[in-house]
Structures are given as C-alpha cells and as structure tokens.
C-alpha cells in the first residue's frame, strides 16, 4: 500500500445500516483488486476431491493436505473405492495430517454415506451436504461455491476474525455470522467475498500481528492500529503466499 494513504482512525459508532453496507462492499472491492487471483487454496479436480480435502483440512494446513492429495486419490478415486479402503492403508496416507485415526474414520463414513444415500455422487444442495458425516455448513459452502458455482459464505477462522475487525458484525457463532454477512452483500458476491477475506487474513490481517501499515483497506477499518502502522515495519509482516 502506498505510504501516502492515511487511514481514518476508526469508524463512527453512529454508522447507519446503509453506511455499513457501503463500507463493507467498498472493502470487498478493494480486496478484489488487491487479490485478483484469490481462489480456494486446496487442490481438487472434482466435487468429491474437494469435499474430502476440505474435511481433511481441519486442524492442519492446506499445503499439507495438497501434498497427500495425489496419493490419496490415486488409490481411492471414487466414493465407492474409498468406502472399501483398508483402514490401515488409508491411515498411512493421511497420517502426515495429524489426527489420522479420526480423519480416516471420517473419510470412511463420508464415502459410505455418499454411496448409500447419493449413488456415489456429491450432492449439490446445502441441505443434502450437511447430512453427510463430518460435513457442516462451512465445508458444504466450500464445496457448493467452488465445485458447483452455488454462492456460499465460508466462515473459517480467518473470515470470522476479519468480519469482526472490520466491524461488520459482532457475531461469533458461525451460522449467525454467515447470515449477518450474507445480508450485507448480493448473493453473487458470497463465494469470492470468502476468498478475498481468507486471502487477506492469511497474508496481511494476521491473528496476532496484523500488517495495518501495509493494508489496502486500512482507511475503512475500525481496528486500524491493532498491528504496526509504520509502512516499513508492516510490510515485513506481509506474506506473498498464504501460510497454509
């Protein structure tokens, strides 16, 4: 961000609903310009792969999940193949991700449910996806938005942190936060909004030390100053790639 940008400290408490909507959409537009290549950072070739890698991404990094993906799907390319997998063999593949026994159990149950209830196909409806073992709204929205083109908001830790820092909502419950943010944006923006905030959270708006002085949306952020505001110091905190 150019050093000449001087953020306005904070957002007035009397901000109206209309002003909030305008500010939120402005932030999203600027983030879209800042991260034109924002996308899901989990690798996948189809809806089944995306569903599986999203489940596996819990409590680990996208980078680690991407590393095991080729071996995993070479061995088990379909729900039927994965449902019939030898447990020990599957545990060996997902072992590097941590919590491998629980994750193996989750994949076996998930694949079996796809075979038994959906003829081995990943459903394209939220109500169906959340009936699958281990699949909540966050995972379902990732799959819908990125594999089916159905708009969805992904409330992960980065997204939740940023919407509160931006003063868009105080909600901490993921479902309530999803609905609160969805009301600020047209549905067509939801999926890319999720990518923009997640990318920004991974690259600049870090949990412990946000790069406030190198933030392209600092002038619209009431949390400006939570991290270093000196541009040179803040720039050192910027990651060119997501840590995951």
Locations of regions flagged by a protein language model:
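Mixed-charge, low-complexity intrinsically disordered regions
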Residues: 1-4
